[in-house]
Regions:
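Short His-centered aromatic/hydrophobic patch
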Residues: 71-76, 93
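Conserved donor-binding/catalytic core segment of Leloir-type glycosyltransferases
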Residues: 5, 166-186, 192-196
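Short hydrophobic beta-strand element within catalytic cores of glycosyltransferases
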Residues: 252-255
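Conserved acidic donor-binding segment of nucleotide-sugar-dependent glycosyltransferases
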Residues: 267-279, 288-293
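A charged, aromatic-enriched C-terminal amphipathic alpha-helix characteristic of glycosyltransferases
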Residues: 18-21, 291-326
């Protein structure tokens, strides 16, 4: 079976148990299918850019035991490129091009770093649609994270609200951010303005916010069960995992047109995508999905029919590993 070294700058650690949890779960899912693996976590949050440079010798040494190196995030890929492993490489972009190069103000510099990364890697995975200028379908692959459909499902809303200490009669708009609700990309200001617009129309505080930030995985599902709508107000995303988890729980979704959300929501009941950050239009969409009659089981079933469950996605990922490993052995 194929052996894979994972290099990532997002992974759960003490003090941030939900950070990069989707990468951790993807690695575990591949391991369940027989992939032997090890992970190098570059904690750039605490170590800054120097952490990437310091990781090079460790990446080089460990990579010699593996068939393929999978780099999660552009910066992990650039550190691995400098490590000169001599191994086939997979680079996963975690958000839209060129926003992957976070922390850099110059759009030209961002684009340059992204270009260097995709030129270096043997396979490049995008969670959102592949940028149009990258035309090699064998090298550039659209493969969003899969959702664990056995864990995320329809639960009783009243019981979930009781466990979270929420008002049984309010309408809750769910906001999700793994790094805190004031993360600029997530546009909490647009979210709150939409909530305020809805309450102004209602004439009282009918709509309330429900913030899902830095919660253990066993608690997260209660937030999806307790909410009435997941409102995604971000300026950009890759393939937002919160949308997939919400839909798997049957929760209606209203989202701006970011990442691959339009593809995920197309044809689903109680799901709307808008190419706008206007709180008035977002409020209209919230009222629209709340007025539809489809139940949560119908939303879940329609979403799962799209093949974005974890097993289906992981099988495709393992196929990429196996192809690269075979090519290296020739």
């Amino acid at each position: 079976m194929v052996r894979v070294l994972h290099v990532t700058n997002a992974f759960p650690y003490e003090g941030s148990i939900d950070y990069g949890v989707f990468i951790k779960e993807q690695i575990e899912a591949a391991r369940d299918l027989g992939v032997e693996s090890e992970t190098v976590f570059i904690n750039g949050r605490e170590g800054g850019k120097k952490a990437y440079l310091k990781s090079r010798s460790k990446i080089h040494e460990l990579a010699q035991k593996y068939d393929v190196v999978h780099c999660h995030h552009l910066y992990s890929g650039l550190a691995t490129a400098l490590a000169l492993t001599g191994k086939p490489s997979v680079l996963s972009f975690l958000t839209d091009w060129p926003y992957e190069a976070e922390g850099i103000n110059s759009m030209m510099a961002r684009t340059l770093l992204c270009t260097i990364g995709v030129h270096w890697a043997d396979r490049v995975i995008f969670k959102s649609p592949v940028p149009k200028h990258l035309t090699d379908p064998k090298k550039f692959i659209n493969l969003p994270n899969g959702v664990d459909e056995t864990h995320f499902g329809v639960r009783d809303r009243g019981e979930a609200r009781r466990r979270l200490g929420l008002d049984q009669d309010a309408i809750y708009l769910l906001f999700v951010s793994s790094k805190g609700y004031h993360r600029p990309q997530k546009r909490y200001d647009v979210f709150t303005a939409t909530r305020d617009q809805l309450n102004e129309r209602a004439g009282y505080e009918k709509y309330r916010e429900l913030l899902l930030v830095k919660q253990p995985r066993d608690v997260v599902i209660d937030y999806f069960a307790a909410a009435d709508v997941h409102l995604l107000s971000s300026d950009f995303e890759g393939s937002p995992n919160s949308v997939k988890e919400a839909l798997c729980c049957g929760l209606p979704v209203v989202s701006r047109d970011v990442g691959n959300v339009r593809d995920m929501l197309e044809g689903l009941p109680r799901a709307v995508t808008l190419d706008s950050a206007d709180p008035n239009l977002l409020a209209d969409a919230v009222e629209d999905v709340l007025g539809q009659s489809a139940d949560r089981e119908a939303v879940r079933a329609a979403f799962l029919a799209k093949g974005l469950d974890r097993h289906s996605i992981t099988r495709r990922l393992v196929g990429i590993y196996e192809e690269l490993a075979r090519g290296a052995q020739r």
